[in-house]
Amino acid sequence: MQSPSLDPAKLTFRDAVEDDLPRCLALDASFQSDYVWQMTVNDGGDEIQVSCRRQRLPRQLVAQHPVDERQLLMALHMDNCFVVVEDPYSRQIVGYVTMRLDMSGRVAYLQDLVVDLLHRRRSLGARLVHVARVWASEFRLQQIIFEIPTTNYPAIRFAQAQGFTFCGFNDHHLANREIALFFSLSI
């Protein structure tokens, strides 16, 4: 379901400020999925095989993107990216992206890409990825790594559609101890 009054062409993309945090936390970051990615690792000494397989769920999963208020607060620092999408007329925030910078590896880690449920399917996510790429190129970074839980199949498909490619995983990377998949995008 979309909000009929929002004109995507007139939205403002700007750096977040601390006063934006409550509005960002209030966004509906939920998602629905009929699939998850199942990870299998076979460690055979001289060879490690990792298999990623799309698995259909017995019933639709409704879940929430894990948003950490402390992590958002840390994203406000100058060496991180925190950009919000705002309707300039209503002053309503409809989405945001956060990335943390790793200058030693010349990488940005995309941690949050949130578009409010009512405002999806309008290319706002793709526009936020573009903003993230511009930000990363200004810091002369080489790539963006997108961290996605295995249960967020819509985000995985979105990342792939934006040109991100699978580059690894971590069993207990996320705050809720869920498996994180990593997708990279060269700058």
Task: Please identify what each model-predicted range represents.
Residues 1-10, 25, 32, 177-187:
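Terminal substrate-recognition subdomain of acyl/acetyltransferases
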Residues 16, 113-115, 148:
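Hydrophobic adenine-recognition pocket in adenosine-nucleotide-binding enzymes
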Residues 19-22, 105, 153-154:
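Short alpha-helical
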Residues 26-111, 116-117, 130-131, 135, ...:
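Acetyl-CoA-dependent GNAT
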Residues 115, 121-134, 138, 157-161:
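Conserved acetyl-CoA-binding loop-helix of GNAT-fold acetyltransferases
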Residues 136-148:
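Conserved GNAT acetyl-CoA-binding A-motif
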Residues 147-148, 160-181:
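Conserved catalytic-core motifs of GNAT/GCN5-like acyltransferases
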